[in-house]
Amino acid sequence: MNLSLIRSMTRSAVFELENGLCYRPAHPFTVTLNGKTVYEACQTNVFSLFSLLPGTEYTVGVQAEGESLTCTFTTEAETFFVDASRYGLVADGTTDNTLKLQAALSTCPKGGTVYVPAGRYRTCSLFLKSNTTLYLEKGAVLLGDNDRTHYPILPGVIPSENEVDEYYLTGWEGNPLSSFAGLLNITQVHDVVVTGEGTLDCDAENGDWWVTPKIKRIAWRPRAVAAVDSENICLHGITVQNSYSWTIHPIFVKHLDLLNFNINNPYNAPNTDGIDPESCEHIRIIGVNIHVGDDCIAMKASKVFLGMKLKKSCEHTVIRNCLLDKGHGGIVIGSEMSGGVKDMVVTQCLMDHTDRGLRVKTRRGRGNTAVIDGLVFRNVEMRGVKAPFVINMFYFCDPDGHGPYVQCRDAMPVDEYTPKLGSLTMEDIVATDAQFAGCYFDGLPEQPIERVSMKNVTITFDPNAEAGQAAMADNRPLVKKLAIYAENVKEIDLHNVKIEGYEGERLHFANVGHFEED
């Protein structure tokens, strides 16, 4: 067992207890800072320290299971400390503080920190700048404006003078469509940190954001945090809740750290995904606690227009020690993935009563740049997940999703609009109280799934399981306690895969090529 520093910032730091367990340690542990107790009973593998001093050396200690572990670190330097309350903030939860907060953010010198003290600050869209830190003190709440007419509209596409080049400023569900600016906007900047123990509360339930959510009114709905075309971005420690739509939505971001923070949206709030990186590179999602009304983490890469034009995949992703709770899917790939999703490793995550666990969703029409490959899921625990493993290449999204082109079960010509699924590896996974299906792999007949490898996987069904839809595709029967279903897969390797409590035959295969089991 080791104690490691994930990242230090100017006034905060985040650490990880390397114990090989999913999200939580076997027993609570004590955390000290320079010999003084900070947490008496820490119950998560990833933890953070706040209210530190910049440019200062500290020693953090952990007493865990009879072991004493220490880690010495130095916080980042800070040039200036900007107290936003000096800009005339009114912390009554009603007064509009948008211009005052924006003034603090805009005038912060390079290398400085904008500090927001405890209080409830009503605000509309805020825009962060390069080389700055936004620190939300414990008890500080940035409360979103309820009136959509107060929000700026960001055009999806900005044309150039030569009328050839285009700049993509925002998007909606994979297309460059005009949308309202988010509560926090990180646009074309670099080296930005948002940290602290405060809260971003979009307050969407008290507006009209969740009413007729699929209808565009003025512009498409905003995100809680929207980041576009930026580099070296970090979100840490805060709580983000009651989002208008997707909660954290980075597009074309390189080197993105999402560390040890909370996302809370009501389960019935429409399209309130937790984290949706779109065509991003070098992503770390570590120690995040997500409770949402849609997919918890969904890796995306645009729809066919941007995906095939820009060919920007979502790649080099690490997801570790996260709690994924009660969403539609735990870890999801797609369905907007026309640029491709590659090289993702998920470890030590706990999925608790999500509808599906590891979920891949795509369809004809995403394009031949829509390649999913190099996905590894290892050391994951699922509790009460209805369908632990789902790969669905007939996903019925978009206006034509129920049409014959998407849903036809006969082989169609492989062309420039045909997506491809490569290699998926699943190892050392335990899923208890499943309901619909343990494994449901549904590839295209003209472009079968290349390879599925499972090793040391145990799935146990809930004795009181109810039937349901394992994959969102037409003409698929409701299933209950279905062990392994696979259709149109080139290769399946099962090594020490145990399924308990299933009904009927264990294997339901159609058009499966090489199959190996031991």
Language-model segment annotations:
Residues M1-D518:
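Extracellular/periplasmic carbohydrate-active domains that bind, remodel
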